[in-house]
Swiss-Prot record:
Phosphorylated by host PRKCA. The gene is PB1. This is RNA-directed RNA polymerase catalytic subunit. It comes from the Viruses. Belongs to the influenza viruses polymerase PB1 family.
């Protein structure tokens, strides 16, 4: 049957048709091999944008550094990083004038955070550059290694468990003449296997001590490791992203806390809120501009794009901003906040793995590590790579490149948003002192600019003024990639606005389907995605019902759990049929056990086990919720878990779903092969570290408690807490005298063991 496609749209407003333009089917592109080339591109580009700056040499590390601040004013439209300090400070002053007390209040909020944050804040986050091993590690391990090295070098402030005290150690470590670290290495040897009598390679792991002098340590402390950004759609070329080490992380966290607190108070800021809250905030700004432009004024909106936002930003500018924002605050607070930008002014970019060479004729492959690029003969490289290496050579030290200007991706998102908003703020009539005025939205490097004026010339003049003002603080609006429209139609951070934000449901399509975690989580995530899209993305009831049926079908095929009375034959059908036949209340069987689906769009918020609990046979209940089931390695399931869902565009989102622990919440065992590598010791450290952290959280459920005065370690804090809790429980009759005595005895034993150690 032929369908005329235009018929589909007869009743649909044009803006709703956006979901039909969905380009992102299939998998996004991933990068393979080394990111060295991309990192060199970033370093070279950043220096090119600031090339008219002044060169200097860092006295501690010997690194050549380029400082473009207060450089020549631009004479053309090329992107440049020559921010003018006085312009940035003036923009900050005007921002404060329009929002009285904003900086003061944010500083007070941040000061409180600084004093309360525990060092385990740094265990959040994924891959982190571990300076002790000179490669990436999970955040928790990198932190543990850093603290271990600090302690063995006599730096012990961190034992209090406060982040600020850990940072004191970081500062002290930079003054030390040398640091001793422990590195892992591998020995391989050939031995005969007793069973098979074949020769096998046996790997043993060794740890060795290594001393770093001040210069080498500083280089590592200031290093950002680089990787290639994966899964970026709509780009031909990959690009590099950076991951900083533990010395920088804590300082950045406090700066971003301050900036976040400021952004929350700025109506033009698209950060730190998200989702519907963000849409509401942005819709307000648009409404304000449209209301004011009544009949007399024209109103136009630019969907903006900035050229190489973070390569033209400069840490020295951020230092100036922080100095201004905190100007009436206590000295210690100003110092803590100024360290991050200072470290970034002296940062080093690690070039990654280096290059891989193959000789077709001799079937040889060899890796040229980044450290060798400084003095290898360039005749082996193709022309473009040769140019890159020649350009970067003066900047190289120990396989890292000195990169003073520029910010690297995703480091100071909040603070750079404050800078962007401060320019939007200058669009008020009392500052432009003319007939045009502007306002807009800023979220990291993405912006939308709304300009109002009595006529087209005024609009043009307003845009020009905005463009030039941005140039003065190192923001380069791209004239090629920005476009202007009558206000009412624009795009901002992948939200499309047409007389209101349009739900672009198709963006969420990749997150529909079976996640592949386990039967319990997958069911829960699947229905939650549908529920969330009904709430946030105009997913209508009929479509949602269809999505649900498709999901259940998909789920049954994935886990081979077709209904017990079906004709479909799979590996599991024999067992499932048997279960079906011996179950009295068949409606109580979970879908993953061959039961019927009881979900409809009204009850998506209820976990399946709860939905069917009353319908289950008693022995089936006992089987589903059985903590002693030997086949399920149970992690303790919180009532809410987080799943990572991939929308088509933008970063992976974290989504909460209800998690009910059943025998279907299994966790696949870890691949054994890791246990024979140098990672093994690291893995054991990591597990021990996680056990300690979760134990600690049992004692202090909020894990952000105010520290009891005079207590120096986690163990002592837990013992003292255990004693207090036991006494309260004993006096209120919740525990017996014998139990109370036993707890006290255990506490004393622990203290005794600590003293002996």
């Amino acid at each position: 049957m032929d369908v005329n496609p235009t018929l589909l749209f007869l009743k649909v407003p044009a803006q709703n048709a956006i979901s039909t333009t969905f380009p992102y089917t299939g998998d996004p592109p991933y990068s393979h091999g080394t990111g060295t080339g991309y990192t060199m591109d970033t370093v070279n580009r950043t220096h090119q944008y600031s090339e008219k700056g002044k060169w200097a040499t860092n006295t501690e590390t010997g690194a050549p550094q380029l400082n473009p601040i207060d450089g020549p004013l631009p004479e053309d439209n090329e992107p440049s990083g020559y921010a003018q300090t006085d312009c940035v400070l003036e923009a900050m002053a005007f921002l404060e004038e329009s929002h009285p007390g904003i900086f003061e209040n944010s500083c007070l909020e941040t000061m409180e955070v600084v004093q309360q944050t525990r060092v385990d804040k740094l265990t959040q986050g994924r891959q982190t550059y571990d300076w002790t091993l000179n490669r990436n590690q999970p955040a928790a391990t990198a932190l543990a290694n850093t603290i271990e090295v600090f302690r063995s070098n006599g730096l012990t402030a961190n034992e209090s468990g406060r982040l600020i005290d850990f940072l004191k150690d970081v500062m002290e470590s930079m003054d030390k003449e040398e640091m001793e670290i422990t590195t892992h290495f591998q020995r391989k040897r050939r031995v005969r296997d007793n069973m098979t009598k074949k020769m096998v390679t046996q790997r043993t792991i060794g740890k060795k001590k290594q001393r770093l002098n001040k210069r080498s340590y500083l280089i590592r402390a200031l290093t950002l490791n680089t990787m290639t950004k994966d899964a970026e759609r709509g780009k031909l070329k990959r690009r590099a992203i950076a991951t900083p080490g533990m010395q920088i992380r804590g300082f950045v966290y406090f700066v971003e806390t301050l900036a976040r607190s400021i952004c929350e108070k700025l109506e033009q800021s698209g950060l730190p809120v998200g989702g519907n809250e963000k849409k509401a905030k942005l819709a307000n700004v648009v409404r304000k501009m449209m209301t004011n432009s009544q009949d007399t004024e024209l109103s136009f909106t630019i969907t903006g794009d900035n050229t190489k936002w973070n390569e033209n930003q400069n840490p020295r500018m951020f230092l100036a901003m922080i100095t201004y924002i905190t100007r009436n605050q206590p000295e210690w607070f100003r110092n803590v906040l100024s360290i991050a930008p200072i470290m970034f002014s002296n940062k080093m970019a690690r070039l990654g793995k280096g290059y891989m060479f193959e000789s077709k004729s001799m079937k040889l492959r060899t890796q040229i590590p980044a450290e060798m690029l400084a003095n290898i003969d360039l005749k082996y490289f193709n022309e473009s790579t040769r140019k890159k290496i020649e350009k970067i050579r003066p900047l190289l030290i120990d396989g890292t490149a000195s990169l003073s200007p520029g910010m690297m991706m995703g480091m100071f998102n909040m603070l750079s948003t404050v800078l962007g908003v401060s320019i939007l703020n200058l669009g008020q009539k009392r500052y432009t002192k003319t007939t045009y005025w502007w306002d807009g939205l800023q979220s990291s490097d993405d912006f939308a600019l709304i300009v109002n004026a009595p006529n087209h010339e005024g609009i043009q003049a307003g845009v020009d003024r905005f463009y030039r003002t941005c140039k003065l603080v190192g923001i380069n609006m791209s004239k090629k990639k920005s476009y202007i429209n009558r206000t009412g139609t624009f795009e901002f951070t992948s939200f499309f606005y047409r007389y209101g934000f349009v739900a672009n449901f198709s963006m969420e399509l990749p997150s529909f389907g079976v996640s592949g975690i386990n039967e319990s989580a997958d069911m829960s995530i699947g229905v939650t995605v549908i529920k969330n899209n009904m709430i946030n993305n105009d997913l209508g009831p009929a479509t949602a019902q269809m999505a649900l049926q498709l999901f259940i079908k998909d789920y049954r095929y994935t886990y081979r759990c077709h209904r017990g009375d079906t004709q479909i034959q799979t590996r599991r059908s024999f067992e499932l049929k048997k279960l079906w036949e011996q179950t009295r209340s068949k409606a109580g069987l979970l879908v993953s056990d061959g039961g019927p689906n009881l979900y409809n769009i009204r009850n998506l918020h209820i976990p399946e086990v709860c939905l069917k609990w009353e319908l289950m046979d008693e022995d089936y209940q006992g089987r589903i919720c059985n903590p002693l089931n030997p086949f399920v390695s149970h992690k303790e399931i919180e009532s809410v878990n987080n799943a990572v869902v991939m929308p088509a565009h933008g970063p992976a989102k974290s989504m909460e779903y209800d998690a009910v622990a059943t025998t279907h919440s299994w966790i696949p065992k870890r691949n054994r092969s890791i246990l024979n590598t140098s990672q093994r010791g690291i893995l054991e450290d990591e597990q021990m570290y996680q056990k300690c952290c979760s134990l600690f959280e049992k004692f202090f459920p909020s894990s952000s408690y105010r520290r009891p005065v005079g207590i120096s370690s986690m163990v002592e804090a837990m013992v003292s807490r255990a004693r207090i809790d036991a006494r309260i429980d004993f006096e209120s009759g919740r525990i017996k005298k014998e139990e109370f005595a036993e707890i006290m005895k255990i506490c004393s034993t622990i203290e005794e063991l600590r003293r002996q150690k």
